[in-house]
């Protein structure tokens, strides 16, 4: 492609809301242009990157035995009413009416239409398993769309849905899709981790997220430095302490005056306590109106997902109000503890491992020291209710856990019959009986992975794409292209030769100043830069620059061809 035949719309102007590097660089490089809040035009260079990602996704999905289709983006309300999502989805569901006043929505996901199609066309187990996918524009009316295409209202997603007769068949396809997502991200060239994830309201036994590692990631993921264990922070767990090795203390409880101390941090600072010897007692109320005292070590944080999954808790829970707490303890938050606690205690394993702990005295301005489990507090339950921290022992006992930030670009689920059952998507099984098909769903954020790639790899000058998805593999940057016949001749011939070799190449024939050409090339992120100028050309040389390494070489065109091949 010649630069004069496409639209290179680089700019120095940035809106104030462009906080993330990916958002800034996509706007500055002219990859996208904002049309409305959370809605973007894909400019030629941006679309080229997007299409390269789509091609990789499509190629790997086809290799995995999936078949592509395309579902409508506008969905009738009747389908979502069958699964009760018409009302449950909330304001993120963009609803509209046609001229006959019939209700429709812009599809946020496509479970209902794919099940509707399947129930009309799949009648027997003999037609299964079947894995269908699409690459489709979706819309979710985010209240505060932000971060550019990372969290836009309109976005492009690959969503696949598989259909099965039994759980083993579903698990086989799930494992295939897990491997396929790894292949996609490997082929793109991103550093990532598949992590065990919460199934949430969907349920089922299996769910994995695919997280691209980046400092700007909103998700926190943990992984073992000694094994392949990895999980989202919501689900991550740790090796439990051996409570049989806990030392029996001979120290007696002591009540100490702690005026105006309401936080663990202030308590440790003013009283010189080790925070790892303290506990926090927080009161919650579950959906059944039951109160519980949740106990974790002073330097740990509660994990909402784990708590809602406890058998004792009727989810969802809420934190008790200050008034509710005072009516139970006759004390305020910040002074609560486990000694003579009037409600049921659920303590984290790490809190249970502490000997001679420090806690609130259930009396304002007082704390207890030297409190011990099983001696002073005997009525309690133990559960994993906290977030893991760096240094925790991996649950498989191999290595310790480390935390990092990630950007979720893929998520796979075993849906089972969550959608097929309410929509009566039944088949005749091998036993001759009618039963709901089991399903898996597999989402991949095509537009989101583009932003994630920028977050993972960039410098102060612009984007450093993985070569597989760079808008152009090579940029020819001729100095004085429109003024020097010799420069033009060499540049044009090199351009044609590279095209003939199947190399994705851009010839910058705009006649722009060298500084502008070089800055644009760095900003846009072409993988290989070839500068053709009079001085080197007299020696039969050109200047080659690798965008990723920044290495420059003065080489012949023959040597350049070897590098590019």
Swiss-Prot record:
Transmembrane is among the record's keywords: no
Signal sequence, renumbered to the chain: none
GO CC annotations on file: cytosol
Alphabetical list of Pfam families matching this protein: HGTP_anticodon, tRNA-synt_2b, tRNA_edit
Gene3D superfamilies assigned to the protein according to its UniProt record, in alphabetical order: Anticodon-binding domain, Bira Bifunctional Protein, Domain 2
Top-rank taxon: Bacteria
SUPFAM superfamilies from the UniProt entry: Class II aaRS ABD-related, Class II aaRS and biotin synthetases, YbaK/ProRS associated domain
Localization in the cell: Cytoplasm
Gene Ontology terms: biological process: prolyl-tRNA aminoacylation
Protein name, UniProt field: Proline--tRNA ligase
Gene it is expressed from: proS
């Amino acid at each position: 492609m010649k630069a004069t035949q496409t639209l290179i719309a680089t700019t120095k102007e940035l809106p104030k809301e462009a906080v993330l590097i990916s958002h800034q660089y996509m706007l500055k490089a002219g990859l996208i242009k904002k049309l409305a809040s959370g809605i973007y035009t894909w400019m030629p260079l941006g679309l080229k990157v997007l299409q390269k990602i789509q091609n990789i996704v499509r190629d790997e999905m086809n290799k995995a035995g999936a078949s592509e289709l395309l579902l409508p983006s506008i969905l009738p309300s009747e389908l979502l009413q069958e699964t009760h999502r018409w009302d449950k989805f909330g304001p993120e569901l963009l609803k509209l009416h046609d001229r006959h006043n019939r209700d429709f929505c812009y599809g946020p996901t496509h479970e209902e239409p794919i099940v509707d199609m399947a129930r009309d066309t799949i009648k027997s187990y003999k037609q299964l398993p079947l894995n269908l996918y699409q690459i489709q524009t979706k819309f979710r009316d985010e209240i505060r769309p932000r971060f550019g295409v990372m969290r836009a209202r309109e976005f492009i997603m690959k969503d696949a849905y598989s259909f099965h007769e039994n759980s083993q068949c579903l698990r086989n396809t799930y494992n295939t899709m897990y491997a396929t997502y790894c292949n996609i991200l490997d082929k793109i060239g991103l550093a990532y981790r598949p992590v065990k994830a919460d199934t949430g309201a969907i349920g089922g036994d299996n769910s994995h997220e695919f997280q691209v590692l980046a400092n700007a990631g909103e998700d926190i993921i943990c992984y073992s430095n000694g094994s392949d264990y990895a999980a989202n922070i919501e689900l991550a767990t740790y090796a439990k302490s051996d409570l049989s090795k806990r030392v029996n203390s001979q120290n007696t409880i002591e009540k100490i005056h702690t005026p105006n101390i309401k936080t663990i941090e202030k308590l440790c600072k003013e009283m010189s306590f080790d925070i790892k010897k303290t506990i926090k007692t927080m009161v919650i109320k579950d959906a059944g109106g039951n109160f519980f005292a949740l106990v974790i070590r002073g330097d740990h944080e509660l994990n909402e997902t784990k708590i809602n999954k406890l058998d004792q808790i009727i989810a969802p829970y809420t934190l008790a109000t200050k008034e509710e707490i005072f009516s139970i303890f006759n004390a305020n938050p910040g002074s609560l503890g486990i000694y003579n606690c009037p409600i049921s205690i659920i303590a984290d394993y790490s809190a249970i491992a502490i000997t001679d702990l420090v806690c609130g005295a259930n009396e304002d301005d007082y704390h207890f020291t030297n409190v011990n489990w099983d001696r002073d507090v005997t009525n309690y339950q133990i559960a994993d209710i906290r977030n893991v921290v760096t240094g925790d022992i991996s649950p498989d006992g191999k290595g310790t856990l480390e935390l990092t930030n990630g950007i979720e670009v893929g998520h796979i689920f075993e849906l089972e019959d969550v959608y097929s059952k309410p929509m009566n998507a039944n088949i005749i099984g091998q036993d001759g009986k009618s039963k709901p098909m089991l399903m898996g769903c597999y989402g991949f954020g095509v537009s989101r992975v583009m932003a994630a790639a920028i977050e993972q790899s960039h410098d102060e000058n612009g984007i450093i794409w993985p070569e597989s998805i760079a808008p152009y593999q090579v940029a020819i940057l001729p100095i004085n292209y429109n003024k020097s016949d010799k420069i033009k001749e060499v540049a044009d011939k090199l351009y044609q030769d590279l095209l003939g070799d199947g190399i994705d190449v851009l010839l910058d024939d705009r006649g722009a100043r060298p500084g502008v050409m070089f800055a644009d090339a760095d900003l846009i992120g072409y993988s290989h830069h070839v500068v053709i100028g009079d001085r080197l050309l007299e020696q039969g040389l050109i200047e080659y620059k690798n965008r990723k390494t920044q290495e420059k070489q003065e080489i012949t065109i023959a040597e350049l061809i070897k590098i590019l091949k």
